[in-house]
Amino acid sequence: MNRFIHLFLILYLSFPVFSSTNSVLIGDLTKDELFLKNQKFYKNYLSAEPYQLNEAPDIDGISVKILFGTWCHDSQREIPKLLKLLESIGMQSEMISLIGLNYSKNEPLNRGEIFEIRRTPTIIFYKNAIEIGRIEETPKLMLEGVGFVPVSMEENLLFILNS
């Protein structure tokens, strides 16, 4: 009987660990928490190619808010690449805010609504606390007379930081 109780307790207490490896994460997160609790993000981060930028952008005074859904395939694809890119240009982790959103694109502090999130992921860039640009869903640029054109994350990042 004692063995049965011990086995039950071990399985019961271990279940949340195994079931949460790809769970919906909501609220403020660190990169380590994201990777530990969601294997898709971690695997995509490991497989992301290192970036070779032709020019180093000026990141003095730059901070980034990343609002995303762990359930969202665009977030699973773009956020690991973005995190690797931000690391490659020397962005310190304390300048990057990761905010997990639920299926309604919101979270307990209502930041989905505050930041007017319509698509995930939404990446908001600030220079000295003033918003200077956004990437919504996938990297793209607006070309006059053409409309939105898909570009790489590097091109979109450089455009925002250099404008």
Enumerate the language-model features and the residues they cover:
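Thioredoxin-like thiol-disulfide oxidoreductase module
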Residues: I99-T120, F125, T138
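Thiol-based oxidoreductase modules, predominantly thioredoxin-like and allied folds used
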Residues: L67-T70, S93-E107
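Stable alpha-helical elements in mature extracytoplasmic
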Residues: E78-K81, M153
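Conserved helix-turn-beta segment immediately C-terminal to the redox Cys motif
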Residues: D58-S63, K81-I99
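Non-catalytic, surface beta->alpha helical segment in thiol-disulfide oxidoreductase systems
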Residues: F125-S163
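Conserved redox-active cysteine motifs that mediate thiol-disulfide chemistry
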Residues: G69-E78
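Sec-dependent N-terminal signal peptides
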Residues: F4-F15
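N-terminal leader/targeting and pre-domain segments
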Residues: S20-I59
